[in-house]
Amino acid sequence: MADSLKMGNLSLNESQHAPAAPPSNGRAAYIPPHLRQRTMGANVDGAAASPPGPAPGAGAWNGPRNAPRGGNWANANASDFSPRGPNVPNGNISWTPTETQRRPFNPHAYGHPGHGGSYGGSHGSAKGSGDGQWRDGKHIPGPANARLERELFGVPNDPTKQSTGINFANYDDIPVEASGHDVPEPVNAFTNPPLDDHLISNIKLARYQTPTPVQKYSIPIVMNGRDLMACAQTGSGKTGGFLFPILSQAFQTGPSPVPAQASGQFGYGRQRKAYPTSLILAPTRELVSQIFDEARKFAYRSWVRPCVVYGGADIGSQLRQIERGCDLLVATPGRLVDLIERGRISLVNIKYLVLDEADRMLDMGFEPQIRRIVEGEDMPNVNERQTLMFSATFPRDIQMLARDFLKDYVFLSVGRVGSTSENITQKVEYVEDHDKRSVLLDILHTHGTSGLTLIFVETKRMADALSDFLLNQRFPATAIHGDRTQRERERALEMFRSGRCPILVATAVAARGLDIPNVTHVINYDLPTDIDDYVHRIGRTGRAGNTGIATAFFNRSNRGVVRELIDLLKEAHQEVPSFLESIAREGSGYGGRGGRGGRGRGGNATRDMRRMGGNVGGGGPSFGGGYGAPSGSSYGGGAGGYGAPPAYGGGYGGGYGGGSYGNPSGPTGPSSWW
């Protein structure tokens, strides 16, 4: 019965995602020769079997390719529109026939991976990476692949690949504060030195012309061997800030030797245990997938092979991609602990440890897993590796924990971190709950179809209900939340990115870290109870110097964040509605929490605690309350430490469960908290 269900979900496009590495069920993936030729022709010659959707900014939701282009949403219910149904061809899959050819084992490159899809179980195949070699102490890049370059880097003016926006030049005016001794001077261009020539060529392919402020400082800091804690505005290039120097040094120094105790583990050109030299940890599967895509891009034609592992996807396919070679590993903490327990990953060779969205990982209860990975396994100690922490906010307690992970670090604060970008026009509307749908329709009709619209709600049920409502109103919408399967989430994101479905209703899963080009409007249908979450939600627009609009529906049920919301609006020079100020004056008892567990953003969320003379060793103030009554835990009492709460009670989409946050091997089983 299970086989028949799996067969029912197969499509021609899915079978193309891994031509070089057939899945475990060979019968399900078999394609007759005549269909292979037809499929290849559709991709090569452009005669796709099903019509693609319009690019972002197109005038309408289009039907068949030869249908007239309209200027409205009239075709939202066209026969090929199925944002929540199974097996929607995305029209963007490219298949390189030569990738299926068998290649001899290359001891310098660990073998050649199969072709992975955009996301999902075969996501980590890293096609194009690992094609280079390290021979006689030199990096020899692999051959160019025009088709793969188009897939990774797009073409000029490709709406799905965003580099810079109209306000990018204004980034030079953003203040930068670097603290620590002997801070290296910033760089103003992608040049050699300090960067490797091959990395610079890939940066040019991505059409990046000038480093962002965080990149100007992080590149020389990391290249000089220093640890780094970096705070920067969301959308300011943090991913490149750690990938560029890590990959550059990898290209210059080559791979690390496999430990002697690993001898005998090799067979047929593979090894059962991977020994990555770089580890990047991030809280969500979507974020690690995005970082992996960037790593593939900038490791193109190099000897470095990136891999990605996360919960919710088939662990068998992830194990197979690791066996083919893993030099740079992007992972969620839960799945990484699982693979370490299985004896499939060793951290003994780690040179670089990156904690991306570090505050969110600790906030969501990943601290025990992170401490086990960093301190309880075979990872080199803090003095034998470089550790980089990147996020948009670093509250005081997070900085106190950083003392255990970093040594003699440089603290980098770029701009008004923890606040919002002035590239975003913020609007706050007073809307009662029963009026939200009608106001939303008015906004969507007013702003038309240009760009992408991201709508945030608090619960999974609301996400589905609102997307169904918009579909009934002839607006092409889809939803993403934790109750949807991994493939459904991947398909929804792909359709949204490509503009085929330009409205996405999301829970907190997409609130932080995801870099989706051309999001021109973010709507907080349900305001979060935490002002930091609001900052990161609206940060999905106005990225890389582009402009965007953020609209928030506010009523008295949101008065807990009114004071911080007013402060944010003033900081970003936005209009403050009079009703916000009147509600804020109603009583001091409503003052916002300011942050999770009452910690507060305060005035020091972006300041280096080492310069403030504070006691960072315990004995600090109590961070009372914890994360909700059900857990029975609180932050620290008077000792200033984490209480490792086992549950988080209520919040995004029906509660945080047992603290597994996207970790199917955690206490919640196959479900994730969002």
UniProtKB/Swiss-Prot annotation:
Binding positions (ATP): A232, Q233, T234, G235, S236, G237, K238, T239
Subcellular location: Cytoplasm
Helicase C-terminal domain ranges (all copies): 423-584
InterPro entries from the UniProt entry: DEAD/DEAH_box_helicase_dom, Ded1/Dbp1_DEADc, Helicase_ATP-bd, Helicase_C-like, P-loop_NTPase, RNA-helicase_DEAD-box_CS, RNA_helicase_DEAD_Q_motif
GO cellular component: cytoplasmic stress granule; nucleus; spliceosomal complex
Catalysed reactions listed for this entry: ATP + H2O = ADP + phosphate + H(+)
Gene Ontology molecular function, alphabetical: ATP binding; ATP hydrolysis activity; eukaryotic initiation factor 4G binding; G-quadruplex DNA binding; G-quadruplex RNA binding; mRNA binding; RNA helicase activity; RNA strand annealing activity
Any single biological process term in GO: negative regulation of cytoplasmic translational initiation in response to stress
Major location (coarse): cytoplasm
Entry text on domains: The Q motif is unique to and characteristic of the DEAD box family of RNA helicases and controls ATP binding and hydrolysis.
Family: Belongs to the DEAD box helicase family. DDX3/DED1 subfamily.
Full protein name: ATP-dependent RNA helicase ded1
Species of provenance: Aspergillus fumigatus (strain ATCC MYA-4609 / CBS 101355 / FGSC A1100 / Af293)
